[in-house]
């Protein structure tokens, strides 16, 4: 064993939250690593959602290469833009960091890395990460490892969602402690790479951001006074438990601390792409659809606030009814498709998509292939005049690879004060209060990176912002391995003390990491975990 490397993933961690804690000395483990090493902002994927982001991190590839854009499979032949299947480890066939290290006879421990369910054989051990069918139990490779670990979470997603804010925080604290206990247990063997992802840091931001921002809709000053410390407390606990883990590991360890994306308070207003497209003449509604759509939205909002519908009930809805709900939420059923040239594709904040209704591709496509590029450029040009839009580009500017055709034709980044919305009439609308209450924290594009240890340059400076796809090439190089030629990421050489040149190798062949076909019970359990944090409805 030449070097040992720890990759500590703090899902959704952002310097916006951590910098004040660093300034007041409340995250001493992180502060020590920054003093010994260097601190950077890490650019996420487009969109910055954990499914796409962690697969990009593991593979060193953009979503156009690995094919994961969301927690649901994109199916742009449907006007809802998604099918009802959920992405999992079998949804991508590209090799991961763990596969490359296994080929090199290096041993990995992969603990709770998202998008590793179902787990697959590697040289080492894998404990599958979010989302899994039952997050109270461990799903592992080898399978017998699960029996020695015990439970991960003490509560189901339903129970976490129903708990008080203080109760939710208590559940997260117990999870972080359990995680560290299990990591210390796993680390007692021989290994070259130990990687874990702490999901509590992301869950806490989704739930508790509303208590940290004065004037957040629906939150009283008394509630902010009572619960305003909860988010900081989770970050402080994550830092303390990272310190406890490091104390049990070799002192000369190399360490990377990363997050898959950043976080921010959820915006209070929505930019409704379909309404804008209708105003510009590229989308048409069926007769009477706007009034029906508005009443349906009001009914959905009332039901979400009033009816005690549990995940147990939701998971037993017939597939046909689920598809109808998806159509209702997206507004697809209200659109007159034979008279529509372009429509919204919902992605993850702050990224939105637009697809052209192309002849031969969509069920009722009307745009001739000869008009595709002129129409796309016209829409892009008009979007650039909107104050709600920060950036807009064709899909080829963000992605490349065999899955490019699954991506929306146009991608746009909203200004921080706007979410994407599905209203078909008003271009800008307020976000319903109930939605802000249930999920008050959102993702943004900038996560964190800290590099410390003997192999890293103290106070290293980077001329370009590092990207999440750079992590795996950098790790392979640090561990003495060649970098596959088809990786999009680059080795972050200014971080590394060694001047050894990068060796480029042929990639491993694409082979599915797991079984893409999940059982109905597996799908239902994973859907419950995703619904708990607002990734699906």
Please annotate each region the language model reported:
Residues 167-194, 204, 210-257, 284, ...:
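A long, amphipathic alpha-helix that forms part
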Residues 19, 71-90, 94-104, 111, ...:
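Secreted, luminal/periplasmic, and some membrane-associated catalytic domains
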Residues 2-19, 33, 57, 101, ...:
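Beta-strand elements within well-structured catalytic alpha/beta cores of enzymes
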Residues 374-381, 385-407, 463-466, 470, ...:
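Polar, surface-exposed loop/tail segments
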Residues 417-472, 477-478:
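Low-complexity, glycine/alanine/valine/leucine- and proline-rich hydrophobic stretches
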Residues 16-189, 199-206, 308-316, 322, ...:
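Active-site-proximal alpha/beta segments of enzymes that process anionic O-linked groups
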């Amino acid at each position: 064993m030449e070097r040992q490397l720890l990759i500590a993933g703090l899902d959704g961690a952002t310097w916006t939250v951590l910098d004040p804690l660093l300034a007041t000395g409340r995250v001493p483990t992180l502060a020590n690593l920054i003093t010994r090493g260097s601190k950077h902002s890490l650019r996420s994927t487009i969109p910055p959602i954990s499914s796409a982001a962690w697969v990009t991190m593991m593979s060193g590839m953009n979503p156009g290469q690995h094919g994961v854009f969301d927690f649901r499979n994109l199916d742009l032949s449907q006007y809802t833009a998604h099918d009802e299947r959920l992405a999992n480890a079998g949804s991508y066939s590209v090799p991961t960091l763990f596969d490359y290290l296994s080929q090199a006879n290096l041993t990995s421990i992969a603990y709770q890395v998202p998008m590793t369910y179902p787990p697959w054989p590697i040289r080492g051990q894998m404990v599958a990460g979010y989302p899994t069918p039952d997050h109270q139990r461990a799903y592992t490779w080898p399978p017998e490892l699960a029996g020695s670990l015990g439970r991960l979470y003490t509560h189901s997603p339903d129970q976490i969602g129903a708990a008080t804010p203080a109760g939710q925080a208590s559940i997260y604290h117990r999870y972080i402690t359990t995680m560290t206990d299990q990591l210390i247990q796993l680390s007692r063997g021989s290994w070259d790479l130990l990687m874990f992802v702490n999901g509590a840091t992301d869950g806490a931001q989704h739930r508790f951001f509303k208590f940290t921002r004065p004037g957040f809709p629906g939150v009283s000053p008394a509630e902010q006074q009572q619960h305003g410390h909860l988010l900081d407390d989770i970050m402080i606990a994550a830092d303390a438990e990272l310190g406890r883990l490091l104390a049990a590991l070799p002192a000369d360890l190399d360490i990377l601390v990363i997050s898959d994306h950043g976080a921010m308070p959820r915006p209070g207003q929505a930019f409704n792409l379909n309404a804008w497209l209708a105003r510009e003449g590229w989308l048409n509604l069926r007769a009477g659809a706007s009034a029906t759509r508005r009443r349906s939205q009001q009914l959905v909002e009332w039901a979400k606030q009033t009816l005690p519908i549990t995940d147990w009930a939701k998971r037993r809805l017939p597939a046909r009814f689920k598809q109808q709900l998806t159509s209702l939420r997206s507004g697809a059923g209200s659109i007159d498709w034979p008279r529509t040239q372009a429509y919204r594709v919902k992605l993850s904040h702050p990224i939105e998509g637009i697809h052209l209704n192309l002849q031969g591709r969509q069920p009722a496509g009307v745009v001739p292939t000869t008009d595709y590029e002129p129409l796309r450029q016209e829409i892009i040009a008009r979007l650039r005049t909107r104050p709600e839009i920060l950036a807009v580009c064709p899909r080829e500017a963000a992605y490349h690879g065999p899955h490019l055709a699954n991506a929306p034709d146009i991608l746009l980044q909203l200004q921080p004060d706007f979410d994407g919305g599905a209203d078909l009439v008003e271009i800008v609308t307020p976000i319903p209060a109930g939605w802000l209450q249930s999920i008050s924290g959102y993702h943004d594009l900038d996560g964190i990176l800290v590099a410390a240890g003997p192999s890293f340059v103290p106070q290293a400076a980077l001329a370009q912002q590092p990207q999440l796809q750079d992590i795996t090439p950098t790790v392979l190089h640090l561990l003495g391995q060649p970098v596959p030629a088809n990786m999009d990421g680059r080795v972050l050489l200014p971080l590394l003390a060694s001047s050894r040149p990068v060796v480029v190798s042929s990639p491993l062949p694409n082979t599915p990491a797991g079984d893409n076909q999940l059982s109905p019970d597996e799908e239902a359990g994973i859907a419950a975990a995703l619904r708990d944090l607002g990734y699906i409805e």
